[in-house]
């Protein structure tokens, strides 16, 4: 019996492309699942093969349409649990609602915790996600929860084009991303710069200054996601004004909300940005200057660890990041 014979892999509506890549790497077929919507908008999701006694993997990003994607996931978990699956592992490449992880103002909800409890109550036995916005979300779960860092996969892709890091500067677009940028800077030997950003209102960003030298440098602005793009575009503009030689945007999740795609395309045409590199946690149509790097191999490795019942998910992180630390990428 193959080590993957006990696994059933289901893809929901938001992650078909990624799930197909994972299935091909694991050399297994995606199992059929029915996803229908009634006239009133209600969803029905049900596996079309027996799942009794099997280990089940469900792949679904809870990105746009966020609420439909989340309900589809919850109903899928519930239907599979009621069909007597042995275990249900949920792979959520992009975890929606993670930014609502605290009460920023009086009377606001902590929706990240609510979503965690809904996933648990539906019947999930473990959760795997990538570059979750706030690591404290893992504390909202009472089941095994792993958030791995796809940013290392993206950094390996970027650095593969360079012989060394002598002219590269890692740029954090705000103070919230300094820890991530510093880790990459230390790992690669690149220098570090920080954009001094102040938020003046909802989706309103005021850029003040750059801390660190970016003049004539190949700059990499690193963030966990591209939402409306205001923060990253503002950072890119001031870094370019300060004399950067090139600017690459690296972000795990490409949400591209509102008119972000058009704004980034224009920024590339205007040579403010040279290119953008994202992971395929969310399905995106490519455009000139956008590179999409797949995390399917990393997820497939996680599923193999899960199916074998030995090892650690942190191995997948180490497998990507240790190459940078050892500087074997050059």
UniProtKB/Swiss-Prot annotation:
- Organism for this UniProt entry: Ureaplasma parvum serovar 3 (strain ATCC 700970)
User: Record's Gene3D superfamilies?
Assistant: 3.40.50.2020
Keywords carried by this UniProt record: ATP-binding, Cytoplasm, Kinase, Magnesium, Metal-binding, Nucleotide biosynthesis, Nucleotide-binding, Transferase
**List of residues binding Mg(2+) 1:** 133
> What residues sit in the active site?
197
Q: Name one GO cellular component term.
A: cytoplasm
Residues recorded as binding D-ribose 5-phosphate, renumbered to this chain, are 199, 223, 227-231
The molecule here is called Ribose-phosphate pyrophosphokinase
Q: What class of enzyme is it?
A: transferase
Against SUPFAM superfamilies, the record matches this protein to: PRTase-like (SSF53271)
User: Listed GO molecular functions?
Assistant: ATP binding; kinase activity; magnesium ion binding; ribose phosphate diphosphokinase activity
Checking SMART domains in the record gives: Pribosyltran_N (SM01400)
Q: Does the keyword ATP-binding feature in the UniProt annotation?
A: yes
Instruction: List residues binding ATP.
Output: 40-42, 99-100
Family note: Belongs to the ribose-phosphate pyrophosphokinase family. Class I subfamily.
| Enzyme Commission identifier(s) | 2.7.6.1
**Entry's cofactor comment:** Binds 2 Mg(2+) ions per subunit.
């Amino acid at each position: 019996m193959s080590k993957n014979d006990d696994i059933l892999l289901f893809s929901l509506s938001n992650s078909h492309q990624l799930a197909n890549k994972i299935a091909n790497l694991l050399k297994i077929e995606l199992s059929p699942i029915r996803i229908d919507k009634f006239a009133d908008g209600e969803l029905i999701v049900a596996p079309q093969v027996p799942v009794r006694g099997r280990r089940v993997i469900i792949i679904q990003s809870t990105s746009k349409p966020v609420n439909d994607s989340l309900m589809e996931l919850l109903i899928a978990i519930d239907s599979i649990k009621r069909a007597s699956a042995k275990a249900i592992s949920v792979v959520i490449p992009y975890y929606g609602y993670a930014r609502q992880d605290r009460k920023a103002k009086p009377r606001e909800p902590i929706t990240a915790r609510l979503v965690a409890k809904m996933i648990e109550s539906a019947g999930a036995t473990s959760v795997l996600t990538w570059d979750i916005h706030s690591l404290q979300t893992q504390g909202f779960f009472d089941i095994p929860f792993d958030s791995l860092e796809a940013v290392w996969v993206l950094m390996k892709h970027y650095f593969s084009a360079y012989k060394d890091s002598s002219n590269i500067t890692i740029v954090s677009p705000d103070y919230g991303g300094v820890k991530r940028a510093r880790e990459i800077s230390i790992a690669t030997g690149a220098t570090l710069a920080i954009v001094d950003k102040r938020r003046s209102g909802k989706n309103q960003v005021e850029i003040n200054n750059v801390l660190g030298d970016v003049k004539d440098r190949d700059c990499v602005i690193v963030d966990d996601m591209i939402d409306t793009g205001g923060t990253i575009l503002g950072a890119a503009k001031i870094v370019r004004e300060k004399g950067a030689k090139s600017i690459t945007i690296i972000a795990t999740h490409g949400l591209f909300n509102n008119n972000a795609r058009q704004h980034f395309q224009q920024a590339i045409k205007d040579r403010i940005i040279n290119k953008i590199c994202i992971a395929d946690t969310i399905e995106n149509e490519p455009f000139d200057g956008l590179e999409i790097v797949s995390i399917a191999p990393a997820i497939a490795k996680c599923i193999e660890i899960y199916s074998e019942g030995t090892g650690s998910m942190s191995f997948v992180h180490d497998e990507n990041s240790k190459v940078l630390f050892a500087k074997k990428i050059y």
